[in-house]
């Protein structure tokens, strides 16, 4: 966010240095940019390569990245939200039909934040690419103590993107399909805070 406005998908550097080797993306870098990564945040902090609103479509093509890393970001993305229907908006833009534009606004599309995050991560990763995430778990004080935490994550969340039975519950919503490398929960610290850590791999086929 810059001067009260969300700056979406605006590269700060045209060719981030991280793209010269394996493409590794660090989502929610904040003020902790990592060397060797394309550092991404909604704010243009020092060291940020791409400013992006991750509740919208992510600014990378399909099968693009070798690794996506995120720590203490996904819980800040809304659990669900509604946006004007993108297909109707595109049709209205192409035809100039005001009735189609009104329909797009009056019939918004509901997006579930957790599903959107996982679907986009899967889309952007290359086959065999890794998603590495550390997120405050709902099983601890770490999730509930922060007033900016607005979506729910724990070990079982990842079942919906890895286990055939759970993935099949919402086939019209979930496109992501991952293999589990490791999912576990970090034991609480002295403040009762704990995190779920997940390493997931996009299948080769």
Question: Where are the regions that the model predicts?
Answer:
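Hydrophobic adenine-recognition pocket in adenosine-nucleotide-binding enzymes
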Residues: 41, 73, 121
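A short glycine-rich, Lys/Arg-flanked "PGG" loop and its adjoining helix->strand segment in the class I
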Residues: 87-100, 110-127
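Adenosine-cofactor binding site in Rossmann-like domains, unifying the SAM/SAH pocket
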Residues: 31-62
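Short, glycine-/aromatic-enriched active-site segment of Class I SAM-dependent methyltransferases
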Residues: 99-106, 136-150
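Core SAM-dependent methyltransferase catalytic element
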Residues: 182-205
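Conserved Class I S-adenosyl-L-methionine
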Residues: 144-177
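Conserved beta-strand signature within the Rossmann-like core of class I S-adenosyl-L-methionine
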Residues: 128-136
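A short beta-strand submotif of the Rossmann-like class I SAM-dependent methyltransferase core
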Residues: 67-73, 117
